[in-house]
């Protein structure tokens, strides 16, 4: 796979990176909010996830107040009625069994 160039926002120099295709499972409503936010920001879902991750790694908030208001609207639209407090508490129902998704343990 050929490396893709990404422009850094701090100093406008380019940083050559190699991106890979991944397959991940996410909570459905959260994914809808993320896709809606990426569309609103006119960036790809991958770029959004990279930005969120880089900010989280440095204990920085990735969004300004206006974007947080948009996120709240998208959460309402898509019925995402939980927040960070739900982290590691998701239970996935699959063919009649419950699986603790947050920690990968079976219940």
Positions of predicted regions on the chain:
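Short Lys/Arg-rich basic patches
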Residues: 1-25, 38, 76-85, 92-107
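Intrinsically disordered, low-complexity regions of eukaryotic proteins
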Residues: 13-14, 29, 52
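Short, contiguous, helix-prone interaction/anchoring segments in small proteins
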Residues: 22-43, 47
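N-terminal low-complexity, intrinsically disordered patches enriched in charged
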Residues: 32, 51, 76-77, 88
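Charge-rich, solvent-exposed alpha-helical interaction surfaces
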Residues: 33, 70-73, 89, 93
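Short, basic amphipathic alpha-helical segments that act as recognition/interaction helices
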Residues: 41-68
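Short interaction-prone segments
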Residues: 65-81
């Amino acid at each position: 796979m050929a490396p893709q160039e990404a422009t850094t926002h701090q100093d406008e120099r380019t940083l050559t990176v190699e991106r890979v295709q991944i397959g991940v499972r996410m909570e459905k409503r959260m994914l809808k909010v993320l896709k809606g936010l990426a569309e609103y920001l006119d960036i790809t879902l991958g770029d959004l996830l990279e930005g969120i991750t880089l900010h989280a790694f440095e204990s920085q908030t990735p969004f300004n107040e206006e974007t947080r208001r948009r996120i709240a609207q998208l959460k309402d639209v898509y019925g995402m009625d939980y927040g960070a407090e739900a982290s590691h508490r998701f239970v996935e129902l699959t063919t009649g069994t419950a699986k603790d998704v947050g920690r990968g343990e079976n219940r």
